[in-house]
């Protein structure tokens, strides 16, 4: 099994194969980002704030190219808060104004109050630039892998190690 590593040319080919897999995944992610006009075209629901519409662990697909249509009340959007790294998935409950100057107020379906406490200090409403995208599709529970990897960091090392071994030890 490990004898295939004895040949330097074969080991280099396996390493290149592994690098090709990683770079292909990266290019697919970047391509999807360009197509959807969203820095994060796929996100995972991390909390129960949107139940019953979305459960923790659901994988959401976003679209941010609404050139002819504005974000409307009732639409589920994903937004970033200034100086915070975690995207938030909530529903638009109020809209003030139109176009690029529109201000949005959001709230989780399972929350008692709106999101004003979650916004950046001094910010009362979201602007269009805060929106990462609108939810257009979802896959239930597929995102639990991401949640497990973030809650148990050692699993990342184990998974990467197994993937690396599979690529290196694979016979052609």
UniProtKB/Swiss-Prot annotation:
The keyword Lipid biosynthesis does not apply. It catalyses: Cleavage of hydrophobic, N-terminal signal or leader sequences from secreted and periplasmic proteins. The active site is at 49 (charge relay system), 90 (charge relay system), 115 (charge relay system). The keyword Acetylation does not apply. It is a single-pass type II membrane protein. It is found in: Endoplasmic reticulum membrane. Glycans are attached at residue 111. Catalytic component of the signal peptidase complex (SPC) which catalyzes the cleavage of N-terminal signal sequences from nascent proteins as they are translocated into the lumen of the endoplasmic reticulum. Specifically cleaves N-terminal signal peptides that contain a hydrophobic alpha-helix (h-region) shorter than 18-20 amino acids. Its EC number is 3.4.21.89. Residues 36-172 are lumenal. CDD domains: S26_SPase_I (cd06530). The C-terminal short (CTS) helix is essential for catalytic activity. It may be accommodated as a transmembrane helix in the thinned membrane environment of the complex, similarly to the signal peptide in the complex substrates. Belongs to the peptidase S26B family. The gene is SEC11. NCBIfam families: sigpep_I_arch (TIGR02228). Residues 158-169 are annotated as: C-terminal short (CTS) helix. Keywords: Endoplasmic reticulum, Glycoprotein, Hydrolase, Membrane, Protease, Signal-anchor, Transmembrane, Transmembrane helix. One of its GO terms (cellular component) is signal peptidase complex. This is Signal peptidase complex catalytic subunit SEC11. Residues 1-14 are cytoplasmic. GO terms for molecular function: serine-type endopeptidase activity.
């Amino acid at each position: 099994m490990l004898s295939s590593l004895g040949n330097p040319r074969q080991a280099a080919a396996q390493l290149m194969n592994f690098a090709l897999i990683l770079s292909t995944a990266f290019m697919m992610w970047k391509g999807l980002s360009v197509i959807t006009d969203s820095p994060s075209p796929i996100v995972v629901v991390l909390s129960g704030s949107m139940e019953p519409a979305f459960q923790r662990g659901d994988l959401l697909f976003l679209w941010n190219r609404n050139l002819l249509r504005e974000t409307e009340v009732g639409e589920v959007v994903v937004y970033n808060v200034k100086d915070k790294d975690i995207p938030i998935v909530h529903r638009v409950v109020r809209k003030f104004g139109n176009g690029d100057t529109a201000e949005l107020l959001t709230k989780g379906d399972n929350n008692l109050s709106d999101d004003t406490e979650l916004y950046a200090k001094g910010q009362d409403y979201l602007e269009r630039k805060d929106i990462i995208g609108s939810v257009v599709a979802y896959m239930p529970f597929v995102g639990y892998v991401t949640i497990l990897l973030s809650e148990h960091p050692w699993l990342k090392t184990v998974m990467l190690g197994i993937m690396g071994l599979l690529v290196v030890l694979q016979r052609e």
